[in-house]
Amino acid sequence: MSRYGLQQLYINGAYVDSTGDDTFDAVNPANGEIIAQLQSATVADVDRAVIAAAAGQKIWAAMTAMERSRILRRAVDILRERNDELALLETHDTGKPLSETRTVDIVTGADVLEYYAGLIPMLEGQQIPLRDTSFAYTRREPLGVVAGIGAWNYPIQIALWKSAPALAAGNAMIFKPSEVTSLTALKLAEVYTEAGLPAGVFNVLTGTGQSVGQALTTHPGIAKVSFTGGIASGKTVMANAAGSTLKDVTMELGGKSPLIVFEDADLDKAADIAMMANFFSSGQVCTNGTRVFVPQALQTQFEEKILARVQRIRIGNPTDEAVNFGPLVSFPHRESVLRYIESGKREGARVLVGGEPMTDEKYAQGAFVAPTVFTDCRDDMKIVREEIFGPVMSILTYQNEDEVIRRANDSEYGLAAGVVTGDLNRAHRVIHQLEAGICWINTWGESPAEMPVGGYKHSGVGRENGITTLEHYTQIKSVQVELGEFRSVF
């Protein structure tokens, strides 16, 4: 028997068996251990989840704002009480260091849920005077049943980012986690039920995007889809959503984000920021600043500072709390990252450090890739143009501000961007010209609940977090009231 056994689907407030027989394995990428088997949902399971969600949503939406708020706040308390337990499960499933999952994944996810729980009472309409005898008012009403489709890099955090505003607005959600990292989403469903969420309001269906994801995005009973993943999959989701019932969509589709270091920057700070923007979570962060632009005159100094910091990375067993760099999420993903590294070598980028799989006995059983820094990179290189989603930094040099802005924007992506400079006038001037939805000045990577997150161009549609996201899980109903006589022209 595997560590976590056989995992069922979660529908209508309880674990239930799939109507099909297919299962798949959850694998710990640190050592290759099969830690669980998960049932694959079928189209019939999607149908029954939609039925359960529609029934539960009516109960949930009929509650007062304060009642819904109290239930979600209880869920926040439970998440925080179980932080360490959930963090260990996330570490086993993703390979992320325990030092990270204990302090980031559940903590920040719970923060988002607490934020939206507090906003529920502010979901209100307007009263609009028209004339002495007539006025109009608006109501913000929930969409109904919505779907969330998660990515594998932040499983429980993404499940909370998607479910928190949806539930706060009075909707029910059917969530499909990535088949690579599904375990904590099921635990989140347990937490919601324990907190008092009505049955059917949060359901979890495990399985592949080709089967479960396809069924969710085309189902006529679903009003909106929130998706995190790649561009190709996002286009399929959008086409399915439009071709079925004109569903609303929110999508975060990754990035190849520029980090611009200016000549007046504190180079130690710039190097620290570049390290966090490339190697946190083993480089598996959508917003990573993987195109690092430095003035040509400072290239050697900057490389020396990066090289010194790479030596301080603590690689190892992710359950060791001293470790801050674990394996990649899966063995197939490791092979993908290694192919990109070989591409960089072939195209003439110089390897400053790393560039190899980690095959020592200590790492041989896991999906480890050494932290890698390429320098002397060109804009046309594959490693510079495509999202690698691994611990690979590309250093590029530039001559002047106009040039670096133009090159930073030369990408199909537009998720994030950042500048490091001592001149705040320049910082704002440059940021205002960068084509990216999330920008940082003299920092990198923080995504607080209050701040909308999303991309320009092919990096996505819509936003997550912030007040605007809550509003987009509602629809506005306008009502006109006539207090006087009605006069017909007929």
From Swiss-Prot:
Marked site: Seems to be a necessary countercharge to the potassium cations: 248
Binding site for NAD(+): 150-152, 176-179, 230-233, 254, 286, 387
Catalytic reaction list: betaine aldehyde + NAD(+) + H2O = glycine betaine + NADH + 2 H(+)
Co-factor remark: Binds 2 potassium ions per subunit.
Binding annotation for K(+) 1: 93, 180
Keyword line: Metal-binding, NAD, NADP, Oxidation, Oxidoreductase, Potassium
GO MF annotation, one: betaine-aldehyde dehydrogenase (NAD+) activity
Pathway terms, separated by semicolons: Amine and polyamine biosynthesis; betaine biosynthesis via choline pathway; betaine from betaine aldehyde: step 1/1
Complex and partners: Dimer of dimers.
Protein name in UniProt: Betaine aldehyde dehydrogenase
Gene: betB
